[in-house]
C-alpha cells in the first residue's frame, strides 16, 4: 500500500525509528534496513497518521528548498539546478501522496499558485513566488520533451515520475495566459490496485447486469457521462472480468491512460492522421473478439463500430451525453439509424462521480459512481441515475449537498 511507512532520520548513523502501519511486516523492515544501513526501530502508527506525517514532511521539504532558492536565486534558479529539480519532485510527490489526479500551476501578477485536484475539486496547495515560475515550467517541459523556447503556443507532452511509493505517468499541457504560462499535469498512477466491478460498489442487480454485458458474444455496450466521470475506470473494471479468457482484446484510446495487462492498447494520433476510425479499421483486421473504443466522436467511427457489433465482435465505447437515453439521440446525430442501433445494443450506462462522506471528519474522502443501466427494451436496472444517487444518500455514503453540487439544485 502507498502509505504504510514513514522513515525518520538516523541521529547517529546507526539507529533509525520508522513509523509503519504493520510492525510485523518483516519484508518491509528488512528492505528499509538494507537501504539505510541502520538498525530499525519500528513504531506502529495508523494509515491516517502516516499520511499526515508524509504531508508535513513534504511541506517542510518544499519550504526548505524555497529558502535555498531564495538565498541564491540570482545565481542558481535555473531549471537544471538541484533545488528546482527537488522542488518539482516534492510537488509531484505531495500530489501523489494526497491522491490528487491533477496539478495546476497558475501564474498571476504576484505569485505562482499550485493547486491539486482531489475528489473532483481543486484545493490550494501553496503559492510560490512569481520568479520561480519560469524555472519550474522549463523543468516540466524538459521532462515532457516539450519545446522550452516557445511560450506563445500551447504544448503537450508526457513523462514518467517515480515517487517514493508510487510511479505515475504524467501528461503535461501548457497554455499561454495573461501572466505567463499555465501548466496542468494529469497524474496516472501505474501501480494502483486494479479495480474490479466488485470494487466499484454498484448494487447487486447493476453489477450483475454489467457482468452479463461483458460476457455477451457480440453487440454494442455504451457508457456515457461528462469528462472525468469515471467511464474508463468502469470499462477497465469490466474488461478485467473477461480478459483472462482465450480472447483477443484491443483498446483504442486517446491517450492510453492505464496499462491493462492482457490487452493490446492502441493510442490514436490525430495529428498524424491516425484517428479512431482509422485505428478501428486496422483493429478489425487483427481478428479481435472485444474492442474498446475510448470515445465515439464522429459519424465514421460510429458507423464502423455498429458494423463491428453486428459481425461477431463485442464493442465497448464511451459517449459524451448527460443520460443513457440521450445516447440514442447522439448516435442519430452521427447518422446511425435507430433500428440499426437497437438491433446491436446490449445496454447503456450513464454515470457521475459523487464524493463519499468521511466518517472520521465532517468532510469527504474518496468518490463513488452513481449509475443508471438502461436495457435495450428501454427499462432501467434498479432505477435511473438520480434514484441511485439518492439511494447512496439514504445509505449514508454521500449527502444531499453533494447531490446538489453534481446534479444541480
Roles of regions detected by a PLM:
Residues 6-16, 70-73, 283-289, 308-310:
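Long, low-complexity, intrinsically disordered polar/charged segments
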Residues 19-20, 41, 78-82, 394:
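Generic amphipathic alpha-helical segments used as scaffolds and interaction surfaces in large
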Residues 2-11, 27, 31, 38, ...:
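Core recognition of P-loop NTPase motor domains used across DNA-transaction enzymes
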Residues 44-93, 98:
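Charged, low-hydrophobicity low-complexity segments
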Residues 81-94, 98-409:
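Short, flexible helix-loop junctions that flank or precede catalytic/ligand sites
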Residues 17-60, 201-212:
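Short glycine/Trp-rich loop-beta-loop segment that forms part of the substrate-binding cleft
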Residues 1-35, 155-164, 169-175:
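Polyanionic, low-complexity intrinsically disordered segments
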Amino acid at each position: 500500500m502507498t502509505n504504510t511507512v514513514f522513515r525518520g532520520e538516523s541521529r547517529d548513523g546507526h539507529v533509525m525509528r520508522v513509523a509503519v502501519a504493520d510492525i510485523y511486516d518483516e519484508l518491509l523492515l528488512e528492505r528499509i534496513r538494507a537501504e539505510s544501513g541502520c538498525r530499525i526501530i519500528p513504531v506502529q502508527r495508523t494509515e491516517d497518521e502516516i499520511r499526515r506525517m508524509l504531508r508535513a514532511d513534504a511541506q517542510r521539504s518544499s519550504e526548505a528548498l524555497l529558502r535555498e532558492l531564495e538565498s541564491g536565486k540570482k545565481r542558481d534558479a535555473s531549471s537544471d539546478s538541484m533545488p528546482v529539480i527537488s522542488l518539482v519532485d516534492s510537488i509531484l510527490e505531495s500530489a501523489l501522496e494526497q491522491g490528487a489526479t491533477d496539478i495546476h500551476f497558475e501564474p498571476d501578477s504576484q505569485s505562482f499558485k499550485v493547486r491539486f485536484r482531489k475528489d473532483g475539486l481543486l484545493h490550494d496547495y501553496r503559492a510560490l513566488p512569481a520568479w520561480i515560475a519560469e524555472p519550474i515550467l522549463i523543468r516540466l517541459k524538459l521532462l515532457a520533451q516539450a519545446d522550452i523556447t516557445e511560450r506563445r503556443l500551447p504544448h503537450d507532452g508526457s513523462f514518467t515520475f517515480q515517487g517514493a511509493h508510487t510511479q505515475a505517468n504524467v501528461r503535461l499541457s501548457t497554455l499561454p495566459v495573461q501572466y505567463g504560462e499555465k501548466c496542468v499535469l494529469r497524474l496516472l498512477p501505474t501501480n494502483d490496485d486494479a479495480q474490479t466491478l466488485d470494487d466499484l460498489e454498484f448494487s447487486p442487480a447493476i453489477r450483475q447486469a454489467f457482468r452479463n454485458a461483458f460476457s455477451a458474444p457480440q453487440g454494442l455496450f455504451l457508457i456515457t457521462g461528462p469528462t472525468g466521470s469515471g467511464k474508463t475506470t468502469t470499462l477497465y473494471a469490466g474488461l478485467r472480468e473477461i480478459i483472462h479468457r482465450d480472447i483477443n482484446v484491443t483498446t483504442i484510446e486517446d491517450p492510453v491512460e492505464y496499462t491493462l495487462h492482457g490487452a493490446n492498447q492502441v493510442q490514436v494520433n490525430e495529428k498524424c492522421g491516425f484517428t479512431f476510425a482509422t485505428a478501428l479499421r486496422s483493429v478489425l483486421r487483427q481478428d479481435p473478439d472485444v474492442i474498446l473504443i475510448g470515445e465515439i466522436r464522429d459519424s465514421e467511427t460510429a458507423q464502423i463500430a455498429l458494423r463491428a457489433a453486428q459481425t461477431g465482435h463485442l464493442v465497448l465505447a464511451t459517449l459524451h451525453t448527460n443520460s443513457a437515453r440521450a445516447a440514442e439521440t447522439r448516435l442519430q446525430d452521427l447518422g446511425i439509424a435507430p433500428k440499426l442501433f437497437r438491433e446491436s445494443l446490449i445496454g447503456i450506462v450513464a454515470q457521475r462521480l459523487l464524493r463519499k462522506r468521511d466518517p472520521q471528519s465532517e468532510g469527504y474522502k474518496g468518490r463513488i459512481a452513481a449509475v443508471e443501466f438502461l436495457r435495450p427494451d428501454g427499462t432501467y436496472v434498479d432505477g435511473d441515475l438520480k434514484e441511485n444517487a439518492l439511494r447512496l444518500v439514504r445509505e449514508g455514503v454521500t449527502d444531499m449537498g453533494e447531490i446538489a453540487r453534481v446534479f444541480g439544485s
